[in-house]
């Protein structure tokens, strides 16, 4: 579980029986979705798919490919595992506002074209397209969330860099 899971899991655990799949020590099912189909033991009613690679600007082809390995192939591998134990009733996918490809505060709707062209955006678009088809074919309700910025304890990316900069005194106070 990454940043989102770290902040959401305590709340989910109070209401639901939660199983975590990932590569950290505290995950219930240890699997690198980018490289393998996880071995699931039970059927799940609802799946929250928040696995993803973000927070870096790729400098090499291998770094670009890593976005597709995690965000797209990881999604394909998760779905393959779910098929083995019975598909869920619903799947919630955490995507990103980057799929829209907007550089400025343009108003977007759900019908806005997906024009993101970074490896991160393209890999998330591919995952969304795969899930849309997979869920349609398997009669699974799909919800796609496209957050713009996630804030909270242990923030990563630009927000985390800004918080760390403030702690080190790199930003002046505005009063």
How would you label these PLM feature ranges?
Residues 19-38:
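Adenosine-cofactor binding site in Rossmann-like domains, unifying the SAM/SAH pocket
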Residues 135-175:
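NAD(P)-dependent short-chain dehydrogenase/reductase
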Residues 76-119, 135:
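Conserved Rossmann-fold NAD(P)-dependent oxidoreductase catalytic core, especially the SDR/UDP-sugar
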Residues 1-14:
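N-terminal Rossmann NAD(P)H-binding glycine-rich loop of SDR-like oxidoreductase domains
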Residues 33-70, 84, 99:
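NAD(P)H-binding glycine-rich loop region in Rossmannoid oxidoreductase-like domains
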Residues 117-143:
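Active-site Tyr-X1-5-Lys
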Residues 66-74, 114, 118, 122-123:
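Glycine-rich NAD(P)-binding loop of the Rossmann-fold in SDR/ketoreductase-type enzymes
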